[in-house]
Amino acid sequence: LHAEQNGAEFTLVVAAFLHDIGHFIAEQQQLTGVDEYGHHQHAEIAANWLAEQGFPASVYQPIRYHVLAKRYLMTELSSDELSTASNFTLMQQGGLLSSKEQRSFEHNNYFHQAITLRKYDDLGKPLTSTFLNKKPLTTPWLILIEQVLAENTT
């Protein structure tokens, strides 16, 4: 919703909607590591699955790196600027980045999209949100998703 309201690129709007799908895939596949906040490797699970489904890299790569973006942004933010879930999972996901890791990430082709996606992600989370109480919307998002997939196959 925030991505769309801010006039983000079409594919980033879809990425913002689908970025946490890895939690649901992990739960559905009964993968080890699912807790009340979802799965700590949800970004990788989602990106791989979306690539397999034919989504363009402009959708799945920002998703792949949005956790790394959180770790990057935490070096400049205080912990009270993140949701409870984001603070809890930060340590599961590797904690803060070193200076070397920060510089490396800044050279990633999807750095800016991942940072933007991460910011939309935190804007969309109430400070007490948990994975288990989220109910995703299904329309009109399905129309957007179909359009992105159709454009990627032409």
Predicted segments, located by residue:
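Charged phosphate-binding loop/patch that engages nucleotide di/tri-phosphates or the phosphate backbone
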Residues: L123-T154
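Divalent metal-dependent catalytic cores for phosphoryl transfer on phosphate-bearing substrates
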Residues: N6-Y120
